[in-house]
């Protein structure tokens, strides 16, 4: 006995005082976690959407490079074309020259919330790139057997400019791919109302 109470009762009281968290502690922890999540979630969503846009631009650049390498390997003029499937724009390598998307041809399907942004009001002017004259991608880029851009009909030799952006989430800016007359691709990034910068 200790102070009129049995020893077992004292030990039991001590164990009860140490066990678990109080309801107030649990509620406060949850409240702090929810506040932190509500602050971080919009930034996380914006970052993911920015990565998606950059990824699509990189895939477009790779498809253009594949078109060029196909022209060199086949010793022929091969073109990158566009078509529409449902609500999405499709870029594809026209390997057989029939100007139609065939089942075996490499392609890039733009997500329905993205568009080819050439000529859009929020797309910065390509003159800020500092690469000289450019011409907008108008649905076709062709490469000859040397891997150079094939300007059909003796067109002006200038870099092609292909811009990609979101249809509604314009705050994420625009990405672009340029193709030099020699067939080299380069990726660009521009914030809304800003200037183009190489990636």
Mark where each language-model region is.
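N-terminal helix-rich module
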Residues: 1-14, 18-21, 30, 35-65, ...
């Amino acid at each position: 006995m200790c102070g009129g109470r049995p020893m077992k009762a004292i030990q039991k009281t001590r164990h009860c005082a140490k066990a678990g968290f109080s309801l107030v502690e649990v509620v406060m922890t949850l409240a702090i976690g929810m506040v932190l999540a509500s602050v971080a979630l919009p930034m996380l969503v914006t970052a993911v959407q920015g990565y998606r846009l950059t990824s699509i631009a990189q895939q477009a650049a790779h498809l253009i490079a594949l078109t060029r390498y196909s022209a060199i390997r086949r010793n022929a003029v091969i073109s990158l074309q566009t078509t529409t499937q449902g609500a999405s724009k499709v870029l594809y390598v026209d390997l057989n020259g029939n100007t139609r998307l065939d089942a075996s041809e490499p392609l890039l399907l733009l997500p329905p919330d993205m568009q080819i942004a050439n000529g859009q009001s929020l797309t910065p002017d390509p003159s800020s790139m500092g690469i000289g004259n450019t011409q907008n991608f108008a649905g076709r880029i062709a490469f000859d057997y040397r891997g150079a851009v094939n300007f059909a009909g003796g067109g002006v030799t200038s870099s092609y400019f292909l811009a990609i952006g979101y249809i509604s989430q314009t705050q994420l800016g625009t990405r672009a791919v340029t193709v030099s007359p020699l067939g080299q691709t380069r990726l660009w990034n521009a914030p809304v109302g800003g200037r183009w910068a190489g990636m």
